[in-house]
Each structure stands twice: as C-alpha cells, then as structure tokens.
Amino acid sequence: TNNKLKISTFNKFLITFIGILFLYLFYLLIPLLYDKSWVKNSIQSKLKSEFKINLDNSSDITYRILPSPHFFIKDSKILSNDSKKKVEVADIKYLRIFLSQKNFFNKEKMSLKRLSVNNANFYLFKEDLKKLNDKSSKRFSNKKIRINKSNIFFKDSLNEIIAIVKIDNATLFFDDKKLLNLFNLKGNIFKIPFTYKLKNTPNIIKKKKFSFEAKSLNLSIENESEI
C-alpha cells in the first residue's frame, strides 16, 4: 500500500510538472502569434528609442525560444541617424534581440532585455569618431549590447580602409548600481591583441576614464579627465 501511495504521489507530481512545463512552453510561444509587420515596426522603434540604433526595416525577423526568448535577424543593416542622408554604418550577420518574459499576453508591453551582435562589420570615418566621443558622454542603455567576432573598418575621406580592428568580444551598457557607462572591448589591430576599457559618469559632473593595454608590446595607457 505504501508503495502504491508513493507511486501515486510520484505520478501526480510528474503529471503536474509536465502540465506546468507545457503551459510554460505555450506561454513562450505566444510571440509567434504577433503580427509580423507589428513586430518589425515595434522592434525598429524600440531599438531606436532605447539604443539609438536605426535598423533597416527590410530585415527579416524570426522568433526563437532557445537559449531564451528572442527575435533573430539575419543579414541586417544599421543606418546612420542623419535625416538628410541614410548611410550604412554596419552590416550584421546575426542579430539577436532578447526579450523580457514578464508579459507575453499583452504585446504592447513587450520589453527588450539585451542585444547580441555576431559577425558584424562596422564602418567608421574620421568625423564618426567625434560623434562617438560625444555620444559616450551621454547615458547608455542599461540593457547590455554584446558584440562577438566582428570588425571595425576605419576609412579615410576617399572611402579607403586604413585600419581594421577585429573584435573578439565587447560589451556596452549603463551600470545602474555604479551609475557608470561601461564599454569593454577585447580584440586586435594589425595582429596585435589589446584590451580597451571605458568608464564615464553621464551626470552633472561628467568624468571619463579609459585604459588601453597591449601586453605583447608591453604597453599600458590610462587616462582620466572631466568632460
């Protein structure tokens, strides 16, 4: 009788567990029911407002639940925010936009959690460096952007490539606890491995600190300044 009771209790637990698992999987699949054009427009709008990323709306978007719920975009392009002339500033082979799981029942409350960029090419001109420097003094999104296995192409005024930075991995976000913009990059230039770290406080008193280290050259540079 005790054995039957144990088996019965186990069966109830197993059935309950499987039932909850199926309900959870069904919940995770709800974004598949969202209208595709709505998803595309919503993603584009949220990327622009939260990350200042102007994504080309011709990109095709699919939804996946593994490793966690996200929209997957293959072969996308990022355009400049210049209203007069849209210039391609990056092409991304694989872009993953991870979602918060708080409320999939109400699509209007869809919230982005973080971004993952893989196999991307970024194109920068001399004037872009000043723009990036100005933007780095403003508050980043507190949602992380991770970049892996990508390249930065520096170009001159004739559109010729003068240098290539290969990115192994990089992260960019605003740390809510430390109240700091953080940007960390590990990569190489001219086949020389290096790490670059940037911290700044986008508050009333704006301070910026960066460090550059290339161990193979026995080179380490640090600088701190008020903006």
Residue ranges and their predicted role:
Residues K52-S59:
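A short, amphipathic edge element
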Residues I53, K86, F190-F194, L219-I221:
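Short acidic/polar mixed-charge low-complexity motifs
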Residues N11, L32-V39, I61-N188, K215:
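Flexible beta-edge/linker motif
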Residues T1-K52:
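N-terminal type II signal-anchor transmembrane helix
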Residues N57, N169-T171, N200:
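A structural signal for short, hydrophobic beta-strand segments that form beta-sheets
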Residues S211-F212, S220-I227:
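Short, intrinsically disordered, charge-balanced linker/junction segments flanking boundaries
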Residues T62, I97, L198-I204, E226-I227:
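A short, sequence-level motif marking secondary-structure junctions
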Residues L180-F183, N188-F212:
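Contiguous, well-ordered beta-strand patches that form the walls/edges
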